[in-house]
């Protein structure tokens, strides 16, 4: 045993339906010496393996550990092993040994209010149970669910690891853009492209009886329905006319009407002017004739 290698035991309680997932995760992380038991009473925790001179009891249990290890190596997805000899009261060992891993490797453990750790503390050194059980209620947030069981004391963040789906897509120019349906820095909520049925019904209830919503009502719709002002106004414009908005003006029609009015007002004056010019011309002609005859 190398003096630089440190070993610890981990007692983990997981649901029966998550045994396969948990075992696959442990093997993928390099933990090979793993055994499953039905209850903590079947566990025989040997002495601290970090001691230079292991006791005789640890040597006597070593054969069962190697047997469990070979069984887990040959059949990784095998069901929990049970004792075949009914006379033996200590059939298996629940342990997790680190092989070729740094000292800061994470060890999954479970939060539990079970008094079993207190019963084991009489026969097991206290340092082996450190950080394995929470004996006092903590104000820290609950650990996240990991493959069906609670994991505390994890040294790495799975959300930033291979389990996290990256929403950024390369555009071919060496830069990245955000997925159109994923959250981004400008809008944390996913992009909504279509109104839902309850949102339509809520707006219809507000604008019933041809009531156009006020500014306060529009702001209330924005908050409760989580819609933009543009989406709301477009939905209302298809069903109601905004009374506060002036009707649209056709400038071509307006110019034509103005021209017609101008023409209708200018016709009588033009006729009078033309008649006066004709009379004056006749007077000039008559005067010129009288002068020539005289």
Swiss-Prot record:
CDD domains: homeodomain (cd00086)
Basic and acidic residues bias (residue ranges): 250-265
UniProt entry tagged with the keyword Coiled coil: no
Expression across tissues: Expressed widely, including gut, the amphid sheath glial cells, and head and tail neurons including AWC, ASE, and ASH. Expressed in AWC (ON) olfactory neuron but not AWC (OFF).
Keyword Transmembrane (UniProt): no
GO CC, one annotated term: nucleus
GO biological process: determination of left/right asymmetry in nervous system; negative regulation of transcription by RNA polymerase II
Residue ranges of the region described as Disordered: 43-119, 167-191, 238-274
Effect of loss of the gene: RNAi-mediated knockdown leads to misexpression of markers of the asymmetric state of AWC neurons.
Principal place of residence: nucleus
Superkingdom per UniProt: Eukaryota
Polar residues: bias regions: 52-63, 81-115
Role according to the record: Transcriptional regulator which binds DNA consensus sequence 5'-CCTTAAC-3'. Plays a role in establishing and maintaining asymmetric cell fates in chemosensory AWC neurons during larval neuronal development. This is achieved by repressing the expression of multiple AWC (OFF) genes, including srsx-3 and hlh-11 in the AWC (ON) neuron. Activates expression of sox-2 in the AWC (ON) neuron.
UniProt name for this protein: Transcription factor nsy-7
